[in-house]
Amino acid sequence: MVSTNAGGIASKQASSMAPNPGKATILALGHAFPQQLVMQDYVVDGFMRNTNCDDPELKEKLTRLCKTTTVKTRYVVMSEEILKSYPELAQEGQPTMKQRLDISNKAVTQMATEASLACVRSWGGALSEITHLVYVSSSEARFPGGDLHLARALGLSPDVRRVMLAFTGCSGGVAGLRVAKGLAESCPGARVLLATSETTIVGFRPPSPDRPYDLVGVALFGDGAGAAVVGADPTPVERPLFELHSALQRFLPDTDKTIDGRLTEEGIKFQLGRELPHIIEANVEAFCQKLMQEHPQAADKLTYGDMFWAVHPGGPAILTKMEGRLGLDGGKLRASRSALRDFGNASSNTIVYVLENMVEETRQRREEAAEEEDCEWGLILAFGPGITFEGILARNLQARARARD
């Protein structure tokens, strides 16, 4: 596994924005990936070869999808070694759920462990200081759940208070931040470890004309893990990155079939409706307005152009529809598009990668003494099965203060 982390910005200049007492902050971020790096240019030939498929129409469709996703690289658990050990995974109609879960359960725990350790190292605290664990995954099914397996792998206290969010899909990372925020603000002194971990191996299958949605997954989704330490009232040695204010979850009635996944003996069967970008476009502005109204001081003085946007990149069409609906210039979703390009849609993990990109952008602007101003306020957004919208109004505590009259 490959892991990395992002914590406070290494700069002689202290944070320009002071945190508010009692408000939850993201104190550190981290991520980890499996060893298999997939270059998008080689996906089509490799996938068709590994699944023994020579259908020219399916190959042409997958080729087109791989270009339109804008993904360049991804990491995946699936490997030639796994296919040699479990050739039935690439065969149509084989009951392989047990094999898939055996592989997935082990992989998500390993990735979550490495991402968590990277995050804690960046934070600078000790694992013994972690009071709560929030674990998010849509890639496993077992009990005890992955939250306990992760707590044991990390050597956390048996008294650590655990929460697991399962099958929340792409909205799971922001949902986890929302839960971590609530815990941090309601339990003085709490330090909450959020970990997300996902793999596509549960849905890997040979292509079929009857399942065109499978090819979307092949072209778009990636594996990995993310982590964050969340706590209120940072100590002098902690370096908070983002302060979390109002949080909102909303499901859209009568849209539950738009993102649909069913566990079967052959793995998960996934369907993604073509109407998803249009549904998000039609509902995102009202959701953002509601989020901002929860904090009137921010709502009164902010326009969309004044804000940063940390958006889960479900796909390029979703980002483009959002830009058009909200009137955002192309640079506002740069962190999201970069995450999609480098890691694909890694489900719940991806929002961590987006936030890390934003931290890095802020660091680079400071080092280069760029004239471009940092946005203090912004929204962290994701969209998942339900259709469920998750959002948090946040402050970038690493932002440089705007000049005021």
Swiss-Prot record:
It comes from the Eukaryota. Disruption phenotype: Defective pollen exine and Ubisch bodies patterning, shrunken and aborted pollen grains, and male sterility. Male sterility and defective pollen walls. Altered composition of lipidic and phenolic compounds in anthers. No significant reduction in sporopollenin accumulation. The active site is at 170 (nucleophile). GO terms for molecular function: acyltransferase activity, transferring groups other than amino-acyl groups; tetraketide alpha-pyrone synthase activity. CDD domains: CHS_like. SUPFAM superfamilies: Thiolase-like. Keywords: Acyltransferase, Endoplasmic reticulum, Transferase. One of its GO terms (cellular component) is endoplasmic reticulum. One of its GO terms (biological process) is polyketide biosynthetic process. Its EC number is 2.3.1.-. It is found in: Endoplasmic reticulum. Plant type III polyketide synthases (PKSs) that catalyzes the condensation of fatty acyl-CoA with malonyl-CoA to generate triketide and tetraketide alpha-pyrones, the main components of pollen exine and potential sporopollenin precursors. May be involved in the synthesis of sporopollenin precursors in tapetal cells to regulate pollen wall formation. Required for exine and Ubisch body formation in anthers. Does not possess chalcone synthase (CHS) activity in vitro with the substrates 4-coumaroyl-CoA and malonyl-CoA. This is Type III polyketide synthase 10. It comes from Oryza sativa subsp. japonica (Rice). The lineage of its organism: Eukaryota, Viridiplantae, Streptophyta, Embryophyta, Tracheophyta. The gene is PKS10.
